[in-house]
Amino acid sequence: MFTKYSHHNGYQDGSHLQPFQYQQQTYNQQSYLRQQQQAPQQISYGFNQPNSPTSSSSTPSSSTAMGNSFQNQRQINLQQQQQQEQFLQEQVFYQQQLLQQQSQIKEQQRQKEQKQKTNILNIYKEGKQKIMMSFYNLYRNYPTEPPHFSPSPIWLMGRCYTSKDNNSNNNSNNNQVPQTQPTQLQQSIGIFQNNNSNSNNNNNHNNNHNNNNNNLTTDLIYRPAIESGFLSDVASMIWFSYRKDFPPIENTNITTDIGWGCMLRTGQMILARALIKHLYKENDMVPEIERKKPHSNYSQVLAWFSDYPSKEHVYGIHQIVNKKQAMEKNNRKQQILREQVISLNRGGGGSSKGKKKKEKEEEINDNVEEWLAPTRISNILRQLIKFQHLEDLEMYVPTDGVIYKDYINNLCNNSNTHNHYQIIQQQLQHLREQQNIQQNNNKNNNNNNPTTTTTTTTTATSSNNNNNQSPPSRVPNGYNNQVFDDESLFDYNTAISSIPPKWKSLIIMIPLKLGADKLNSTYIEKLKLLLKLPQSLGFIGGKPKQSFYFIGFQDDQVIYLDPHFVQESVNPNSFDYSNTYSGCIPQKMPFTQLDPSLSIGFYCRDQASFEDLCDRLSVINNCEFPIISVCQKLPDYQIECELVDDYAESETTEMLAITIANGGNNHSCIPENIVVDDEEFIVHHHIPYNPNNNQNNNQNNNNNNNKNNNNNTNQQQTPNYPPKLNTYQPDFSSDGEIDDFTMVG
C-alpha cells in the first residue's frame, strides 16, 4: 500500500497511477507520518508515570539510555520532516515538468499547423504562378502586328520619321532621320505569333486599309519605308519583359516576376537605352550584325541585365530586388535609431531593437513582389550605377523636379571631384584631431588638470585648418562630420589618379507627378516637346499598376514598349540570348490615359550636350506650366546626395554626426547598447556612454570660464567647421543612400 522513502530512489512519483489512486497514496503517506510523530510522545508518557514499576527501579544508566532514545527520536522526527518537505518539493517539480511538457506539445502542434498552412500557401502560390505563366500571354493577347500609323510625323526620342511631303517642313531639324529602305520584321513578329489573334488582327488591318483607300494616293509610295524604318529602329532597341524559371530570388522561392516586375523591366529598358547611347556614339540604333557579335559592347550590356544571381549581372532582377531590400532595411534602421535617441532624450530606456529588427526583416522579405513606383526604381538604378564604379558615367535623380547646374558641375567635372576628395580628407583629419582632443579632455578631467592640453591642441588644430583651407563644396553637412576608422575601404590616391581629366557623361532621371488622379491635359504638349529633344531617353510610367516604356508619339498617341509578355529565362552564354531581348512590337495609346506618376530620362554625353539640354528646357519653361526647371545654384535648404557615398539621409544620422563632430559633448544622447551594422560610423567610434560626463564637462567648463578669457573659451568649445548647408532636413525616404549593400552571388 505504501512504499517507504529511499535515499536512492525516493518516493514513487505516482505518474503511472490514476488520479484517484495517486490521491489515495498521498493520503496514506501523510497518515503514516502522523503516526510516526505521535509515537515518541507515547513513549515519553510511559517513562514519566509516577506509579510505573520501572520508575521506582530506575538507575543512572537507565536515565542515560532514556535520554539517548529521546535524541534518537528527535533525529528521526527531523529526518521525517525533511523527507516530507523533499516529497512536497518533488511533487511541485513534477507538476512543473508536466506543465512544460504540455506547453511544448502545444507549441509543436501550433508550429506543425503553421507549417501546414505555409505549405498550402506555397502550393497555392506556385500553382498560381504556373497558371499565370501558362495562360498569361493568351490572357494579355499580345499583338502580333504593329498599330496603324497616320501620315503624320513619328517622333522617337529626338528622331523624326516623316514622309517626303513633310521633308521641306522638317529640314531645319538636325535630328531628322529619313528612311528609304523597307525592312522585314518577320523575326520580331514570329515571337508573338498567335493563331487566334493573328486572324483578328489581319482582318482589322485589312478593314482599316480599305477604309483609307481614298487618302493614300501619295502616302502609298513613302509610308511603307517610313514605317518600316521606324519599326526597324524600335526592333533594334533592347526590350525587357516578364521572365519565368530564372534562379530563385534570395531567401524566397520566387522564380518569375509576372504580375509585379513591370516597373522593374521598364526601368531596365530606359537604363539600357542610356548605356547603348553611351557606348555607341555614332549610331545608337545598333545594327543586327553588331548585335550578333559575342564580345561586342551590345552583348556586354545585355550581360549586365541577365536574370542570374551573380556580381557580373549588376542590373539583373536579383540585384535590383536586393538593392530594394537594402534601402528598406536602411530606412528601418534609421527609424530605429531615431526612436532610440528620442526615447533617451525624454529619459526613457532603450527599445527592444532585436525583436523589432527581426520582425521588420521578415516584413522586408515578404515585400519582394511589391510593385515599385517610378521614383523608387530611379533611385535604385542610380545606386546600382554608383556601385558599378563607371569612371566616365554618372546618374542624377533630383528630388524636386529641378536641375541644379552647379551641382551637376561638381558631379560630372573630374577636377571638382579631385578637390572634393581633398576636402573630405581634410575634414576626416580635422575630426580625428577633435576626437583626440576630447579624449585628452576626459583624461585631464580625471587627473584634475583639464586646461593646458586642450588649449594648445585646439590652437594647433585651428591653425592647421586655416593653412589647409579649401574652397567650399556642396557636400551635405552630415557627410563632412562622419569619421571612418578604416581608411583601407577607400584609397584616395588610387581613386584620384585613376580619374581622367574630362567631363563625365550624365544620365538624368526626373520623377514627376503631373496631376492628382489622372494626367493634367495641360502637360501633354510639354511631354511631346520633351520627347523631341535629342537628349531624350523617353519616360517610364503608364497606367495604375501597369508600367510601360514610352519612347515617342504621333499626333495625340504616345508610343510605348510593353513588358507584359512572358518569356523563358535564357542563359547569357547561349547562342540565341540576344534574340530574346529585341524585336519588340510598339503600341500606341492616348496621352489622356497616362498615369500622372512618371519618370523622364535624359542622356548628356558631354558638357556641351548638358548645356544644350538646359537651354532647351529653359525655352520650354518660358511657356505656362513648366514641367522641369533649371537653376544655377543649389539652395541652402536643399540637399542632393549623388556626390555622397555611404550617407544616410535622416535626422538621426545628422544629429549623431554633429554630436561626434562636436567632440562628444552631447553624446549623452547616444546609448551604449545601440547596435547597428558594421558600416555605421557610430560603431567605428566606440564612444563610451557615461551619463555623468556631461555634468563633469559642464562643471569643468564653468571653472575654465572663470579662469580664462572668453576668447580662449570659445576657441576650446567651438571647432572650426564648414557652415551648415541645410536649414531643415527634407524627407528622402525614397532616396536612401545604402552603405551596407552587397551584390548577390
From Swiss-Prot:
Pfam families linked to this entry: Peptidase_C54
Record's keyword terms, sorted: Autophagy, Cytoplasm, Hydrolase, Protease, Protein transport, Thiol protease, Transport, Ubl conjugation pathway
Leader sequence residues: none
Superkingdom classification of source: Eukaryota
Biological-process GO terms, alphabetical: aggrephagy; autophagosome assembly; autophagy; mitophagy; piecemeal microautophagy of the nucleus; protein processing; protein transport; proteolysis
Example GO molecular function: cysteine-type endopeptidase activity
Region feature (Disordered): 29-68, 192-215, 344-363, 439-480, 686-745
Main location: cytoplasm
Listed EC numbers: 3.4.22.-
Active site: 262 (nucleophile), 562, 564
Any one GO cellular component localisation term in the record: cytoplasm
Subcellular localization(s) per the UniProt record: Cytoplasm
UniProt feature, compositional bias: Low complexity: 29-42, 52-64, 194-215, 439-477, 688-719
Listed Acidic residues bias regions: 734-745
Reactions it catalyzes: [protein]-C-terminal L-amino acid-glycyl-phosphatidylethanolamide + H2O = [protein]-C-terminal L-amino acid-glycine + a 1,2-diacyl-sn-glycero-3-phosphoethanolamine
Family: Belongs to the peptidase C54 family.
Function as written in the Swiss-Prot or TrEMBL entry: Cysteine protease that plays a key role in autophagy by mediating both proteolytic activation and delipidation of ATG8 family proteins. The protease activity is required for proteolytic activation of ATG8 family proteins: cleaves the C-terminal amino acid of ATG8 proteins to reveal a C-terminal glycine. Exposure of the glycine at the C-terminus is essential for ATG8 proteins conjugation to phosphatidylethanolamine (PE) and insertion to membranes, which is necessary for autophagy. In addition to the protease activity, also mediates delipidation of PE-conjugated ATG8 proteins.
Protein name: Cysteine protease atg4
Source species of the chain: Dictyostelium discoideum (Social amoeba)
